[in-house]
Amino acid sequence: MPAEALLLANLFQPLINVANAVLLFFHDTIGLSWGLSIIGLTFLTRALILPLSIKQIRSMRALSALQPQIKEIQEKYKDDRERQQREMMQIYQDNNVNPFASCLPLLFQMPVFLSLLYLLRSDTFQQELHSGGDPGFLFIPDLAEKVTGWVLIVMLVLYAGTSVIAGLIMTGASASKQQRMIQLGLPLLFTPFIISFPSGVLVYWITTNVWTMGQQAVIKVFFPPDPPPTPEEIKATKPPPPPPKKKNRNR
């Protein structure tokens, strides 16, 4: 293992130990297969960060409601990017919106993702995985190894499809063309890295995408978003223009 990778593995060792303990609990205590144990780890992770996911959804809804004002500022100050950014940040501040809150669930999942990656590549866990005689899951022959051939194609289709659908559901119908292009392009961007990962990591990521899709469906039914503001409501939220300066007349 390269020195940089070894340093990162040592940094995440406490989380790797936790992930290992969770997988062993699901497999040895409950009696699930290793594939279902990884799915259980995914569900547990997503349940723990559910408050962050709710905050993410609220932030994205608030950003969506502010889009008319944002577009107006972008058009008004299209030749002055510094003023444009300043005015946009002022709108976020006035409405208590953090434009970066939508990234929190992904940021908190990355340590778990990396911990699972290092765990599946470790010799100790691979011995544990193969000792029970069930290293595979469904059509996947070995969760600790990267897949090839038609299995790889199926996994990539599942990964890309669930990533795109989950991303588009998260951004909603009000997403800009640029946001939609990003959601479509991200799976392609990560594909060269994904194909070299153990297949268990792909199981984790596909499962978290499915969780996102289900989570959004539940929230949409039980907590529907507020209707978009009318032009009159948008106009009412804008501060009144400053009064014109009185001209000094020389008597």
Predicted regions and their residues:
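Helix-loop-helix
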Residues: 1-251
